[in-house]
UniProtKB/Swiss-Prot annotation:
Gene that specifies this protein: ENODL5
PROSITE patterns named in the record: PHYTOCYANIN
Pro-piece positions: 171-188
Lipid moiety-binding residues (GPI-anchor amidated serine): 170
Primary site of residence: membrane
Compositional bias ranges of the Low complexity kind: 129-155
GO cellular component: plasma membrane; side of membrane
Transmembrane regions: none
Region of interest: Disordered: 127-157
Record-given protein name: Early nodulin-like protein 5
């Protein structure tokens, strides 16, 4: 095989491998319970606890499932005051998907009067890079409760399927690439 064909094949394989490593995850906010008002004041920081138990990267999505409620993306000041005058996003369609399109902090609150004050709010930190080891923002409450009305370790949603598929595809892509490189260059 001439060298130009080998170069084209190697470039194709490298490109294929790079695309196979890219994946995004959809997180279901609050796990099975969804976007609800926490049941008690002691659980008022449950959404921030849920967010801190997960790692978010650019391209991931958050799915908010709720009934007779809404979700707003707001500024830090509006988050602290539980009052939004100019939300960046307002949705009340009972199934909102929000794409995390940049690194940094995102602030979410319920748009229903009184819900935010009862703890239906959340800060999500999106990592700078996949290799970053920074932690999401700490809970805004000084009390740390080990029990929560939201499953702490459940990023529920499509994470298990999407992540599993992406990892399988990445592994398969790597193996196929390695076999093709070995066969193209006659290394065996």
């Amino acid at each position: 095989m001439d060298s130009s064909k080998k170069i084209i094949i190697v470039m194709f394989l490298v490109t294929f491998y790079m695309f196979s490593c890219v994946s995004s995850t959809e997180f279901e906010v609050g796990g099975e319970n969804g976007w609800i008002v926490p049941k008690s004041k002691t659980l008022g920081d449950a959404f921030n606890q849920w967010a801190s138990d997960n790692r978010f990267k650019v391209g991931d999505t958050l799915r908010f499932k709720y009934t007779k409620d809404s979700v707003l993306v707001v500024s830090e000041e509006e988050y602290k005051k539980c009052k939004a005058t100019k939300p960046q996003l307002y949705s009340n369609n009972e199934d909102t998907v929000f794409k995390l399109d940049r690194p940094g902090l995102f602030y979410f609150i319920s748009g229903v009067s009184g819900h935010c004050e009862k703890g239906q709010k959340m800060i999500v930190k999106v990592m700078e890079t996949e290799s970053s080891t920074e932690s999401p923002p700490p809970s805004s409450s000084s009390s740390s409760s080990s029990s929560s009305s939201l499953p702490a370790s459940t990023p529920k949603a499509k994470k298990s399927n999407a992540f599993k598929t992406a990892v399988q595809f990445s592994s398969s892509g790597f193996v196929v690439s390695a076999v093709l490189i070995v066969s193209v260059f006659g290394l065996v």
